[in-house]
Regions:
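Short, glycine/charged-enriched hinge/interface segments at domain edges or termini
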Residues: 2-14, 22, 66-231, 374, ...
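Phosphate-binding chemistry for phosphorylated carbohydrates and sugar-nucleotides
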Residues: 153, 237, 348
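Short, low-complexity N-terminal leaders and the immediately following helix N-cap/first helix
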Residues: 1-75, 80, 336-360
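Helix-rich terminal scaffold detector
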Residues: 1-4, 8-16, 177-310, 314-320
C-alpha cells in the first residue's frame, strides 16, 4: 500500500471514465408508477401517452370575427346577413343560411357550411348586415380543422420525454390525469466531521460551517431528485454508523468528509461494516481524488443504495457530484441520454495546466456560440467555493504539463 493507505502504489487509480462506467454499471432505474399531473413536473414518462380524441375535436375559429361561406363572397356583393352569436363553448344551433355570417369568437366551433372566418377588424356593420372589407378570401382562412393537432390514438408525448409544463398541458388536454413515470430518486446527504457546525451557528476555534449539505441537496433537487440532509455526524464510530444506516433507506446516499486516509477518516470502514460493497476508493481526478463509491445490499425487491463518499472540501465535493453522482441520478430517474452527454468549450485565452491528474477548473462561458467560449476563473483551489460558485461549469484539462493555446477545444462540465 502507499503511505496514505490506498493501494494506488501497486494498482493504478481508475480514470474518470473508468470510474464513471463502474458507477453507471451499478445503477438500476426505479420502476415506473402512476403520478397525478400535479406531481409529475420534471419526471420522465415511462409509456407513450395517446390522444383520446381528435384535437381540436371540431373545426374551430382562430380569431374573433364572422364565420361565413367563401362562395358567398366571390361575387361583388360583400354584404352578409348577421346570424347567431357563437361564443367559445357554445354549440351552433343550425347551419349557415343563404348569404349569412355567424358572429363567432376565438375557439368556438364553426356552424355547418362555414369554411372561412373573417377577422372582426376586416369588417364593418351596416344595420342587420356585416360588410366584409377583407379583399382576399380563401377557404380555410382563420380556421383550425378538426384533428389538425392530433387524431385519436396518436402518440402525443413519447415515453422517455421529460414532463415539462407544456407537456403536462398537452397531457391534460388529451384526458391523461395520471401518467406512468419514473419516480424521483430519494437522496440523503450525511455530513460528517467534528469540525463542522450548522450555518446558523458561529464556528468555534478550528471549526467551519457546513456548506456541503445545502449545496448537495440543492444539486440533487436540480438533477430531479427528492433530497434531504441529516444532522452532522461526529467522528465517532458508533454515532457515525448510526447516521449512515439511516441514510441507507434512500436510493442514493451522499456522505461528505471522512473518506481520505487520516486517522479520523472513518467513513469507508463504517460503510463496509454496514454491508456496503466498495466498488472503488480514489479516482485520478483533481479536485476530488478521495471519492469513495459503493453499493449496499438489496433490500427485498429494492436495489441496493448507491453510496458516494465525497471529500470534505467543498469544490472537490461539487466536482465529485457533477462527474459521478449526477449521472447516476439521471439514470435512476430514467434519463439515460443525460448521463452520457458530453460538452466542450473553446478557450478564450491561453492556459497552462500542471499536474499528473486531470483537473476540473471553474470557468465562465463568455459567448453562446457552438461550442461556447470559456474563460477560466481566478481560483485558489478546492477550498475556494466562493469563486467556483460564479462558474458556469468546469473545464476538464487532461493530466500532464501542457500549455493550451487560445481557441483550443476542451471538454466542459456544465454546472446546471
Amino acid at each position: 500500500m502507499s503511505p496514505d493507505g490506498n493501494r494506488e502504489g501497486r494498482i493504478p487509480l481508475p480514470s474518470v471514465d473508468q470510474a464513471l462506467a463502474m458507477v453507471l454499471g451499478r445503477v438500476v432505474a426505479r420502476s415506473p408508477r402512476a403520478h397525478v399531473l400535479a406531481d409529475a413536473l420534471g419526471l420522465v414518462l415511462a409509456r407513450d401517452a395517446l390522444a383520446d380524441l381528435d384535437m381540436p375535436p371540431f373545426d374551430k375559429a382562430l380569431v374573433d370575427g364572422y364565420a361565413a361561406r367563401s362562395s358567398d363572397l366571390e361575387a361583388g356583393d360583400r354584404r352578409l346577413v348577421l346570424g347567431e352569436l357563437l361564443p367559445a363553448g357554445a354549440t351552433p344551433s343550425r347551419g349557415l343560411g343563404d348569404r349569412e355570417a355567424a358572429v363567432i369568437m376565438t375557439g368556438a366551433p364553426l356552424p355547418l357550411g362555414a369554411d372561412v372566418v373573417v377577422m372582426h377588424e376586416r369588417t364593418h356593420r351596416s344595420g342587420d348586415f356585416v360588410v366584409i372589407d377583407e379583399p382576399s378570401i380563401k377557404p380555410g382562412q382563420n380556421i383550425l380543422r378538426r384533428g389538425r393537432e392530433a387524431r385519436a390514438g396518436d402518440v402525443v408525448v413519447e415515453r422517455g420525454r421529460e414532463l415539462t409544463p407544456a407537456r403536462l398541458g398537452v397531457l391534460a388536454s388529451f384526458g391523461c390525469p395520471r401518467v406512468m413515470a419514473t419516480p424521483r430518486p430519494e437522496v440523503v446527504v450525511v455530513p460528517t466531521g467534528d469540525e463542522l457546525v450548522e450555518p446558523d451557528s458561529a464556528p468555534g476555534p478550528g471549526q467551519i460551517r457546513n456548506s456541503g449539505s445545502t449545496m448537495l441537496t440543492a444539486l440533487a433537487v436540480q438533477a430531479g431528485a427528492r433530497a434531504r440532509a441529516l444532522e452532522i455526524a461526529p467522528d465517532r464510530p458508533e454515532a457515525l454508523r448510526a447516521a449512515l444506516e439511516r441514510g441507507l433507506d434512500a436510493d442514493l446516499l451522499i456522505v461528505t468528509g471522512g473518506v481520505s486516509a487520516g486517522q479520523r477518516d472513518l467513513v469507508p470502514a463504517s460503510l463496509e461494516a454496514l454491508g456496503v460493497e466498495c466498488v472503488f476508493h480514489k479516482v485520478r481526478i483533481k479536485p476530488g481524488k478521495p471519492i469513495w463509491f459503493g453499493v449496499a445490499r438489496p433490500r427485498g425487491d429494492r436495489p441496493g443504495t448507491l453510496v458516494f463518499g465525497l471529500p470534505g472540501n467543498p469544490v472537490g465535493s461539487l466536482v465529485g457530484f457533477l462527474v459521478f453522482a449526477r449521472p447516476a441520478l439521471w439514470l435512476l430517474a430514467g434519463r439515460p441520454g443525460n448521463a452520457f452527454a458530453r460538452s466542450s468549450a473553446r478557450l478564450e485565452g491561453p492556459f497552462s495546466h500542471r499536474g499528473d491528474r486531470p483537473t476540473y477548473f471553474p470557468a465562465v462561458l463568455t459567448t453562446t456560440s457552438t461550442p461556447p467560449v470559456a474563460r477560466p476563473l481566478e481560483w485558489a483551489g478546492s477550498a475556494d467555493l466562493r469563486r467556483a460558485a460564479e462558474a458556469d461549469g468546469f473545464l476538464a484539462f487532461e493530466a500532464g504539463d501542457r500549455d493550451y493555446a487560445a481557441g483550443e477545444i476542451v471538454p466542459f462540465l456544465p454546472m446546471g
